């Protein structure tokens, strides 16, 4: 496997009877910083802060979009991608609690709904990507 990004689709192919689920925040400044800062001079040149976070998020969201598109052909793969929460600027949804992980437009209160769904073979997998962040996330 030359492209580590193909791991998601590779797992879906190798384990077609398994239910796979992926969850990240779009507004990440931790994993995206690790992934892009040293490799993109235009990001490395900007001091840490809001401007750098915006550059990181632009690349991260684009990559998430490609990743989601790659998952779409696989019925055994679900995803849960809320915008973010104001808590350590990370991609992880399970740090400390599920607070602030809801996707309002999909009527999903928090990540717990996705986890429960992932474990229920009688339900189609949730595929939720937040597109309408209407308010800041004060509970995160």
Name the predicted role of every residue range.
Residues 1-140:
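C-terminal His-loop and adjacent cap/lid subdomain of alpha/beta-hydrolase
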């Amino acid at each position: 496997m030359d492209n580590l990004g193909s791991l998601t689709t590779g797992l879906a192919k190798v384990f077609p009877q398994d239910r796979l689920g992926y969850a990240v925040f779009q507004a990440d400044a931790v994993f995206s910083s690790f992934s892009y800062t040293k490799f993109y001079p235009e990001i490395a040149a900007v001091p840490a802060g809001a401007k750098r976070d915006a550059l990181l998020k632009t690349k991260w969201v684009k990559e998430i979009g490609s990743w989601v598109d790659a998952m779409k052909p696989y019925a055994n793969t679900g995803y849960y991608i809320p915008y973010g929460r104001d808590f350590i600027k990370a991609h992880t949804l399970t740090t400390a609690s599920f607070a602030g992980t809801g996707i309002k437009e999909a009527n999903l209160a928090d990540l717990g709904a996705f986890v429960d769904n992932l474990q229920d073979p009688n339900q189609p997998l949730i595929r939720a990507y937040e597109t309408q962040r209407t308010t800041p996330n004060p509970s995160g």
